[in-house]
Amino acid sequence: MANVVTEPTARTKAAARTRDAVKIYGKGQTEVRALDGVTVEFEAGRYTAIMGPSGSGKSTLLHCVAGLDTLTSGSAFVGDVDLSTLDDQRLTILRRDRIGFVFQAFNLVPTISAAKNITLPLLLAGRKGDQAWISKVIEITGIGDRLEHRPSELSGGQQQRVAVARALASRPEIIFADEPTGNLDSRSGTEMLTFLRRAVDEMHQTIVMVTHDPVAASYADRIVFLADGRIVDEMQKPTAERVLERMKRFGE
């Protein structure tokens, strides 16, 4: 199956992109080609979902373009920075200063309050942060009445709100979210997706989210579909029904 090359129009700036991205795990008979020549651009100020069957390369693509893993060949860029040109220290600084992350696991520091968890990346970077921006983040995520509570005193949904607020607090150029609703019940998951949607619409953030859930994907502006490590399709202005119908075709 040939790769579908997905690029924005000439007027659209890419917040992140890959070019002919290949990721191979193992060698010989155990070799797995997780990414097979993927070229894709993630547009600034938009919400993109990545979907595909299990083992299609969704999380591998996200991890490589976010600088959490390295490509076997090809290129990955955040803005105009080629990640392959950075040593470990510079890559760490880029992730800290320019990227926000939201994972299925909340990854909060258990011994400090929600408020301190939200601003911890700024503290580690030696930055004060924009207080007006942080206040807006707290408003959007609806965590204002729980700021002095430690993670153990919060529900799963509340902990994920704190994790999203932490990702937004540093005003990153792009946020990568890997199955962010995976550990949440239906109500908390819907709230989380609404927060991410508002972050794009009201705060002009850029979000790239891996998900297997058609309802979650319907919150995005665009969906990129992977199969066998290749981009096989994309969808603009998705609905849950259209996404579900498209996903069914992967089983044919």
Regions found by a protein language model. Give the residues of each.
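Pre-NBD coupling/linker segments of ABC/ABC-like ATPases
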Residues: 1-10
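ABC family nucleotide-binding domain
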Residues: 13-220, 226
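Alpha-helix capping and helix-coil boundary motifs
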Residues: 4, 129, 239-242
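Conserved beta-strand-loop-alpha-helix hinge in the C-terminal portion
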Residues: 230-252
